[in-house]
């Protein structure tokens, strides 16, 4: 999803959760690379739990539950709601979440989830097949789950009254910590996070929901779209192009989101989604866009663009020479009044060339003022930091035999 679009939906969900009074507190579970982006979007008052590595929804929910239990010391009777952070929906969705939480509170079932009334047969979603209504309250016991069936099976499931699995779950905290303990026996959050790789790489649906002995579903019949695929996301865009894009009049049902400075030209394209960012370029038939995750997991490379609390950076160039010597070039922007940490590297040298703005530089506890045109060489082993007096832009060239984000030691520094 485009960063700008993601900002809007996440902030909207947090606002609606607060307005409906469903939650006493909100915690966001995400990857390490998304941490600063989330903080920039939602503010520092919302805790962010980061996965050490990407391992699917069960490990992520297990880690977040462990954080609440062992770090925040929440009661095992606390009702936990798990939901995606960017649904496209309406107010009734959040009222249904309240009903899900109430169902757990009233001990209707140990695990309660939201079922979306399907509007058409789809192979994109998992299905929840209900049985009898619990005391005629519009809460159904679950007969079985079917994960992403073919179209013929999907039609049959809908005829049986099945719901789409909306990815919203509620349970008591102790229910989840008992499951966590089966995999990692400890009561400290730090140990669970350090042993995160011991969790199976599997979805919450497969590992928990489908194995649950006591599970119920609360239906939601309002407007809902899963914006987890480009096909559904582009349906909500008011324009077919965003960014530097030229598209001819013969192109049909094509959406282009371009976050790069380079132009994208589309001539006679049909039913495509094209998304370009510093991390890569996606070109997909819209009807196949749900398969992106299968191939994206194969792309294990460092992020080429990251938002941080102090600003942002993008990787401009990387190189490796015949003798193993490497270089990496970044462009960094630091917001006015913000600073990067006081730090040292053991395996690389850096050269900073300031191209806009004014700031304060610290090298081994010695301060100086820097501005456009200044170039600073920072040898390995030298402590360094910079603070922006006005928005500061500079080019950083790293060089050495080992260039790794982990090559950093941070220190406290008072400006």
Please identify what each model-predicted range represents.
Residues 171-354, 358-376, 382-388, 402-403, ...:
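Left-handed beta-helix
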Residues 2-9:
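Short, small-residue-biased leader/transition segments that mark boundaries at the very start
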Residues 130-160:
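A short, charged helix-loop
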Residues 46-134, 177-182:
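Conserved beta-loop-beta/alpha segment of the NTase-like Rossmann-fold superfamily
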């Amino acid at each position: 999803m485009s960063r700008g679009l993601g900002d809007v939906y996440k902030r909207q969900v947090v606002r609606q959760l607060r307005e409906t009074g469903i939650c006493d507190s909100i915690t966001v579970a995400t990857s390490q690379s998304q941490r600063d982006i989330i903080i920039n979007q939602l503010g520092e008052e919302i805790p962010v739990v980061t996965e050490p590595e990407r391992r699917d929804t069960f490990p992520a929910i297990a880690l977040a539950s462990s954080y609440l239990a062992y770090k925040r010391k929440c009661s095992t009777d606390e009702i936990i709601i798990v939901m995606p952070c960017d649904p496209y929906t309406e107010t009734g969705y959040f009222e249904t979440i309240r009903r899900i939480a109430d169902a757990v509170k009233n001990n209707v079932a140990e695990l309660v989830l939201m079922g979306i009334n399907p509007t058409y047969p789809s192979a994109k979603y998992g299905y929840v097949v209900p049985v009898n209504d619990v005391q005629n309250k519009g809460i159904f016991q679950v007969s079985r789950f079917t994960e992403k069936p073919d179209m013929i099976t999907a039609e049959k499931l809908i005829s049986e009254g099945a719901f789409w699995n909306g990815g919203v779950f509620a349970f008591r905290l102790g229910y989840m910590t008992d499951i966590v303990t089966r995999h990692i026996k400890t009561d400290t959050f730090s140990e669970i996070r350090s042993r995160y790789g011991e969790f199976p790489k599997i979805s919450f649906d497969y590992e928990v929901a489908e194995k649950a002995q006591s599970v119920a579903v609360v239906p939601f019949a309002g407007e809902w779209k899963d914006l987890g695929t480009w096909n559904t996301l582009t349906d909500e865009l008011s324009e077919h192009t965003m960014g530097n894009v030229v598209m001819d009049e013969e192109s049909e049902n094509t959406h282009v989101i371009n976050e790069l400075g380079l132009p994208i030209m589309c001539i006679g394209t049909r039913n495509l989604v094209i998304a370009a960012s510093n991390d890569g370029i996606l070109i997909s038939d819209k009807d196949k866009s749900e398969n992106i995750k299968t191939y994206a997991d194969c792309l294990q490379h460092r992020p080429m663009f990251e938002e941080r609390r102090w600003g942002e950076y993008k990787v401009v160039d990387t190189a490796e020479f015949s003798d193993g010597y490497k270089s990496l070039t970044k462009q960094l922007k630091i917001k006015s009044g913000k600073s990067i940490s006081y730090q040292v590297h053991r395996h690389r040298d850096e050269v900073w060339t300031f191209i806009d703005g004014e700031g304060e530089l610290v090298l081994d506890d010695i301060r100086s003022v820097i501005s456009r045109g200044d170039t600073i060489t920072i040898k390995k082993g030298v402590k360094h930091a910079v603070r922006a007096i006005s928005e500061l832009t500079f080019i950083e060239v790293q060089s050495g035999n080992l260039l790794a984000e982990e090559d950093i030691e941070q220190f406290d520094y008072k400006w």
